[in-house]
Swiss-Prot record:
Post-translational note: Predicted to be exported by the Tat system. The position of the signal peptide cleavage has not been experimentally proven.
Signal peptide annotation: 1-37
Family classification: Belongs to the melC1 family.
Disulphide bridges: none
Protein name per the record: Copper chaperone GriE
Function comment: Involved in the transfer of Cu(2+) ions to the apo form of o-aminophenol oxidase GriF in the grixazone biosynthetic pathway.
InterPro entries (alphabetical): GriE/MELC1_sf, MelC1, TAT_signal
Low complexity composition bias: residue spans: 34-45
Amino acid sequence: MPMNRREMVMATTGAALAAAAAVPLLSGGEGEGAAEAAAAPAKATGRGREHTERYLGRSIRVAAPADGGGVFIDGRPLHIMKFADDAYLSSMCHYEMAPTPLHAARRAVEELRGAALQPSTHGTHVTHL
């Protein structure tokens, strides 16, 4: 029996919704729980402790403010600016605010896509955390 247009649209929509609902189940459940787990060390970096981790094969270090602060990717400094509302902006992601320096560094690693972080050429800003 041939399907009319309405039945075809309903079947296609139903299949698309079912596929979208299955994505969290098939991807290991990386949703809000994974974001909360990733935020735990990030919250610690905002409280004066140094944090070091490997992210996507890169080394990220957020130095403690007592040690001069700063964010480093593979030992190279990442220019980070802190705003009054406790948001951070990096030179790699200039249009996206991050809640912590660690989140800004992770986003910069994603933007680098394996390339080496180049030093800042303008030299007019100092990284303050």
